[in-house]
Structures are given as C-alpha cells and as structure tokens.
Amino acid sequence: MYNLIIFLPLIGAILSWILGNRFSSIPTYIVSISCLFLSMIISWIAFYDIAILKNDFEGVSLPWINSGEFRALWEFNFDTLSCVMFLVVNTVSAMVHLYSVGYMSHDKSKARFMAYLSFFTFAMLMLVSSNNLLQLFFGWEGVGVASYLLIGFWYNKKSATSAAVKAFLVNRVGDLGLSLIHISEPTRPSQ
C-alpha cells in the first residue's frame, strides 16, 4: 500500500494529461487533486506506522540493470527519513494543487499545468525514496525536467523561457556534483 505514495502522483499526471486533452478542466482537477490527497493521507499513515511505531516495510524491489558484474535494483526506501520527506512533499504538493485551481482558473492549459505539477511531485518522491545513486539520479533528472516545464509553462513569454533555460543549466551543475560523488565513491549501486 505504501508504494502508492510514490506512484499516485504519476498516475495523476498521466490521467490529467489524457483527460485534459478530451474533457474540460474539472475532471483533470478532480483526478490530480484526488491522487495527491490520497498520496498525502497514505504518507501520514506511513509516517505514523514506520516513524512512530517503528514498523518495517519492504518496498518494491525489482531487478533493473544487470550487466556483467554490475547489478542495480529498482527499489524504494521506506525509513523514518523517507517517511518524513513523503509527508512534507505530499502535504505541500497537495496544498499547491488545491491552490492552483483558483490560480490557474483563467488559463486555457490547466490540464497541462496539473500534469506537470503531479509529475514534479512524482519525481521529487522518487528522489527522496531512492535506494541507490543511479535511481537517485533519475529522480534528480525528473525534478530537473519538471522544473524546466513548470518554470517555462507560459512559453510565449520570453522571461519564462529564459528562466526555464537558466534553471535547466543550473540543474546540470547538480548533475556534475552527482557524477563527482559517484566517481569519488565507486561503490555498487545496490547490495
């Protein structure tokens, strides 16, 4: 059940994108906000169960990359720190989604905005729950792409596109930092 914390925002993003192309903005709002609030509620439950009651939870663990001696698993970390981050990310994101209903009421691209926002939440959750550096890198890149899309949302404004490119370039500095960490600490991504 706790795996839904991570995947509900992705489901919300995909459905928002699909529904937004076919229907009015109301179904898009309902789907994306429902997915986020459900993810937030499960985050609070996970926080209580794992951080307060100290119960263990094994998340998804799937073979991802096998190449010679290199092996990487796709797995999520559910410990106290991750649960605190789930709580913070999902609670803030749910409130931002709710606020966006009024803020974006004048815009014609509401569905696209909600899809980008839900994708940003998913990428952030992937980042904070990753159990190895390779998966963390994918979460980091997802956050970078989502930031670029959100900052440059009003792409017809020169200031928005300029700021989006600037954010994208700054994110490359983070990529360099992650690469330097990997080079200086050459450990196996998964045990």
Can you name each region flagged by the protein language model?
Residues 1, 15, 19-115, 184:
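Transmembrane helix-loop-helix hairpins at membrane boundaries of multipass inner-membrane proteins
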Residues 1-7, 11-12:
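Membrane-embedded, hydrophobic transmembrane alpha-helices
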Residues 9, 79, 116-119, 126-178:
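Functional transmembrane alpha-helices
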Residues 181-191:
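Single conserved hydrophobic/aromatic residue that forms the stacking wall/gate
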